[in-house]
Regions:
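Solvent-exposed polar/charged
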Residues: 4, 33, 57, 174-177
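Catalytic-core segments of class I nucleotidyltransferases/pyrophosphorylases
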Residues: 65, 85, 115-182
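Short alpha-helical
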Residues: 1, 46, 146
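Conserved beta-loop-beta/alpha segment of the NTase-like Rossmann-fold superfamily
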Residues: 11-15, 22-113, 156
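Glycine-rich loop at the start of a catalytic domain that most often binds anionic cofactors/ligands
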Residues: 2-10
Length: 182
């Protein structure tokens, strides 16, 4: 697990020390000091919206980033940096999006939006995994977000949606009624 990857590995450290691989030993020891990671476990798989809500007490009243591990983004400027810059300009929830093939829209949350500038869309609507025939666009949410903390109260009152889970897209759709989203 990711938790174990960034944790100390006493067995590995001992082996490297015994074999005299001191450069590697120093690298391994430094891994756990590179970043601070806090883990909040979702006790049962009730959807992404539920997973995010589980972090409410940790996040508090701050905007936060969500970065899903099932999408890899290869961009000249890192995706998270782009989202932060957009947040700093618009001071509201920001969704990372990408165009997908029309036949793939049923695999993603899809955005209906108005193009503003420099890859920025103002969100008009969000649909979680729409039918190919009814999708409003092929602009897909790609699993990168900056979200403002108002989402927590919304998720708390969001009924389970597709697959009986609390969907983040459903919560964002409610949030969009009271706050612009890009």
């Amino acid at each position: 697990s990711i938790e174990d990857h960034f944790d100390k590995s006493v067995e590995l450290e001992l082996e490297l020390e015994q074999k005299g691989k001191l450069d590697l030993l120093e690298m391994v020891r430094n891994i756990s000091n590179m970043i601070n990671i806090h883990y909040i476990r979702q006790k049962e798989p009730n959807g992404l919206g539920h997973a995010i809500h589980c972090a409410k007490s940790f996040i508090g009243d701050e905007p936060f980033a969500v970065m899903l591990g099932d999408d890899v983004v290869d961009a000249e400027k890192p995706c998270l940096k782009q989202l932060i810059e957009a947040y700093e300009e618009y001071h509201t929830t920001i969704l990372g999006v990408q165009q997908v093939a029309n036949e793939d829209v049923d695999k993603y949350g899809i955005v209906e939006g108005k193009y503003i500038e420099n890859g920025i869309y103002k969100v008009k609507d969000l649909i979680e995994k729409p039918d190919i025939e009814t999708a409003p666009s092929n602009i897909a949410i790609l699993g990168r977000y900056i979200i403002t903390p108002e989402i927590f109260d919304i998720l708390e009152n969001t009924k389970p949606g597709k697959n009986g889970e609390i969907q983040l897209t459903d919560g964002l759709k409610k949030k969009k009624k009271n706050q612009a989203m890009y």
